[in-house]
């Protein structure tokens, strides 16, 4: 089944069904808070956000009686019906900052083909560019300077079959972020900037504003577009041909290693999380999302902070110092989470510290140099003592236990 609901979610469904606002035999008016709750409570890995919202609303309205069994049944039925709906071809345009001369060719993630550094003299690009400019002019008589700068950037175009343009964008963004995650792990900044008038992302490759969905001919599908925060004074990184060659080689090696991982699906999620964490203009968010990344790769849901810190520190050259840094980062994270007053000027330092702290565990998780078969094997490895005397003692005890059991 694509979806699953725990007991506490089922209690919520039961309370919803017995609410006086719900008429007998049907669901009547459903408030957005109920749908929002169920949308975040249900695990549906194969559905986009748009599809999941449709599935929940349809299941709630069509299930004759709100029971756990009927709700799940109608969720799965609705999901299968979406698969059978008419799908159309779409192309999603993503202007990319920092990818000049670096990312080219075609890649496929999931069921999405991505073409990088699209030829803007092609018939599709000419029509798409004209429609993008027209779209913006209908909102303003003059194009913002930022948008003018964006249109000069290289494009990545995602080709996808989908039920509508919103679903097409969500799936395309999900796919291309994996590719940008690969490049970001290799190219993101490792040290703080000496001079910076404002907070800028750590990633050196970014989605630029004004992302649009088009028909295969290039005509824009609707007046909707996606926009993210941007700084008009950002200068794209410059790279020599030798640097570009080295980056591409490292990306290809990392790509091959991820494809062979026993936990490949989760590793691809890590690529998305890494890109998103360090693409923020608000570096406090980068710091917090960096900690979430540590939680994602450092253990299961029940893993405590002390254990996460110990595991991340174990893989560093100086575990004792790294553990102290990890405890400091956790303290700052707790202060921010609870709304305590901190020095905002240290956001950049914290973000880079977090990135550096999680890096060894991240690289080990994505490359699996010790050929572990399960994530838990990696975590157990990181739980071993750092001190050689303690390791020797533990090894002797294990050898003694093995000898005893073999008798």
Segments from the language model and where they lie:
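Short runs of predominantly hydrophobic/aromatic residues within well-ordered alpha helices
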Residues: 267-270, 283-290, 294, 322, ...
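Charged/polar positions within long, soluble alpha-helices
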Residues: 302, 334-341, 363-371
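Charged, non-catalytic interaction/linker regions at domain boundaries
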Residues: 23, 32, 36-285, 361-364, ...
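Glycine- and acidic
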Residues: 272-278, 313-315, 339-343
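Flexible secondary-structure boundary motifs
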Residues: 287-320
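Charged, amphipathic alpha-helical stretches
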Residues: 1-29
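Histidine-centered, metal-coordinating catalytic motifs and their short helical/loop contexts
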Residues: 319-351, 359
């Amino acid at each position: 089944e694509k979806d699953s609901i725990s007991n506490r979610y089922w209690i919520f469904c039961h309370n919803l069904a017995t609410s006086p606002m719900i008429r007998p035999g049907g669901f009547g008016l459903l408030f957005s808070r109920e749908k929002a709750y169920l949308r975040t409570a249900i695990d549906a890995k194969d559905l986009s956000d748009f599809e999941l919202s449709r599935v929940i609303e349809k299941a709630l309205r069509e299930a004759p009686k709100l029971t756990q069994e009927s709700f799940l049944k109608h969720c799965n039925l609705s999901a299968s019906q979406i698969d059978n709906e008419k799908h159309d071809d779409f192309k999603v345009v993503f202007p990319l900052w920092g990818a000049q001369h670096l990312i080219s060719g075609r890649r496929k993630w999931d069921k999405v083909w991505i073409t990088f550094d699209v030829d803007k003299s092609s018939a599709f690009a000419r029509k798409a560019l004209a429609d993008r400019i027209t779209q913006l002019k209908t909102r303003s008589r003059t194009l913002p300077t930022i948008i003018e700068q964006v249109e000069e950037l290289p494009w990545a175009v995602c080709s996808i079959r989908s039920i509508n343009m919103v679903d097409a964008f969500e799936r395309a963004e999900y796919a291309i972020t994996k590719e940008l995650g690969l490049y970001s792990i290799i190219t993101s900044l490792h040290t703080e900037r000496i001079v910076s008038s404002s907070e800028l992302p750590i990633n050196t490759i970014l989605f630029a504003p004004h992302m649009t969905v088009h028909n295969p001919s290039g005509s824009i599908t609707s007046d909707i577009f996606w926009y993210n925060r941007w700084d008009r004074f950002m200068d794209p990184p410059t790279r020599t041909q030798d640097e570009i060659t080295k980056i591409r080689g490292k990306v290809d090696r990392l790509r091959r290693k991820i494809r062979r991982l026993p936990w490949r699906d989760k590793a691809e999620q890590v690529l998305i999380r890494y890109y998103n964490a360090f693409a923020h203009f608000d570096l406090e968010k980068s710091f917090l999302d960096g900690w979430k990344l540590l939680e994602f790769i450092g253990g299961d849901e029940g893993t405590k902070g002390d254990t996460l810190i110990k595991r991340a520190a174990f893989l560093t050259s100086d575990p004792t110092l790294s553990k102290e840094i990890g405890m400091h980062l956790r303290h700052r994270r707790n202060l921010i989470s609870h709304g305590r007053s901190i020095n905002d000027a240290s956001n950049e330092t914290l973000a880079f510290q977090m990135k550096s702290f999680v890096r060894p565990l991240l690289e080990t998780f994505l490359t699996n140099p010790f050929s572990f078969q399960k994530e838990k094997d990696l975590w157990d490895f990181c739980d071993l003592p750092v001190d050689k005397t303690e390791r020797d003692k533990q090894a002797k005890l294990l050898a003694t236990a093995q000898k005893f059991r073999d008798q």
